[in-house]
Structures are given as structure tokens and as C-alpha cells.
Amino acid sequence: MKQRLNYHHHNYHHSYPHHHHHHNYHYHSYPHHHHHHSHHHHHHHLPSSPPSPPSPPSPPSPPSPPSSLSSP
């Protein structure tokens, strides 16, 4: 009976190394995913730039002063 237990334990131990190898593969994938995430975050930041449009409205204001100066 004891021998049978040993066999089962051996089988489990053999499976463990295989699983460990698979885990290693996943770890390698992690760095790749992290890089992709970083790129996505940067892209999201770019859209935030649109707030710049408010700047154009400012130029229209200057034209008004010239008109007043022309009146005199």
C-alpha cells in the first residue's frame, strides 16, 4: 500500500515541473503586456491635448481693438 502512495506522489511531482515551466512562459508574456499597456496609456494622454482649441477664440479678440483705433 505504501508503495502505491509513493507512485501517486511521484506522478504529482512530475506534473509540478511541467506546470512550473508553463508559469515561466506566462511570466515572459507579462512584460510584453506591460509594454502594451504603457503605450495605450500614452495614447490616451494625447487626446487630452484637444483642450488647446480654446486658444483660437483668443485671436478673434485682437481684431476688435484695431477697429476701435481706426474710428478715431
UniProtKB/Swiss-Prot annotation:
List compositional bias (Basic residues) regions by residue number: 1-46
Composition-biased stretches, type Pro residues, lie in 48-66
Locate the region Disordered.
1-72
What organism is the protein native to?
Dictyostelium discoideum (Social amoeba)
The protein depicted here goes by the name: Putative uncharacterized protein DDB_G0287191
